């Protein structure tokens, strides 16, 4: 149908090839503190927002304004979860999320997503996958977030809050078999679920 005639562009964040991402690299490498709590969410979020703004302004603003479809691999939504977990208090979390929405979508003028698909990977599976992966930012050790198990547990729990608050679409990436071991779903299966969400948005 007409969907195949629509222009589509994919973007990924952080954009490590951009000079705008340099503070993020420093942050993830632990140059501002080795613990995830050493940099408060408002400061950390500002770094990521600048990276997204630089990408938007230099790479895809005109394309987007001309009706192009943007598929983002991580976006403001990733920042929400990774920073909100630094607050235990619900009021502080809510205040931060309210601030972040205003900061990026109003002050910075970044486009608000029409839909968010959460690719939901069980924590025990994702930790195995991370152990096998060499991190983009810090060699075999990943980054300061990924080395902290308690932090990853908190992040996984926080996704539940965000799914409810923003009506995100949860896409399971693994199935639990009778043996209680998880099996990864195929790329095609995951793609079909994501496409089902997108199809409903297209005119």
Cite the ranges covered by each PLM segment.
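A glycine- and Lys/Arg-enriched "phosphate-lid" helix/loop adjacent to the NTP-binding pocket
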Residues: 77-157
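Short loop/turn elements that form and flank the Walker-type P-loop nucleotide-binding site
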Residues: 65-66, 111-112, 164
């Amino acid at each position: 149908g007409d969907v195949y005639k629509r222009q589509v562009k994919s973007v990924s964040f952080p954009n490590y090839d951009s000079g705008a991402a340099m503070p993020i690299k420093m942050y993830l490498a632990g140059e501002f503190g080795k613990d995830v709590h050493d940099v408060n969410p408002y400061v950390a979020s500002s770094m990521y927002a600048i990276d997204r703004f630089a990408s938007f302004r230099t790479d895809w603003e005109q394309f987007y304004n001309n009706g192009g479809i943007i598929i983002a691999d991580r976006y403001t939504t990733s920042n929400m979860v990774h920073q909100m977990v630094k607050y235990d208090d619900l009021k502080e979390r809510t205040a931060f999320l309210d601030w972040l929405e205003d900061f990026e979508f109003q002050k910075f003028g970044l486009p608000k997503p029409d839909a968010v698909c959460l690719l939901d990977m069980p924590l025990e599976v994702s930790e195995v996958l991370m152990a096998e992966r060499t991190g983009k930012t810090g060699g075999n050790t990943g980054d300061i977030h990924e080395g902290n198990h308690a932090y990853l547990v908190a992040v996984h729990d926080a996704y539940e809050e965000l799914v409810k608050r923003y009506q995100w679409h949860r896409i399971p990436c693994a199935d639990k078999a009778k043996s209680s071991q998880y099996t990864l779903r195929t790329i095609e299966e995951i793609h079909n679920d994501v496409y089902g969400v997108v199809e409903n948005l297209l005119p």
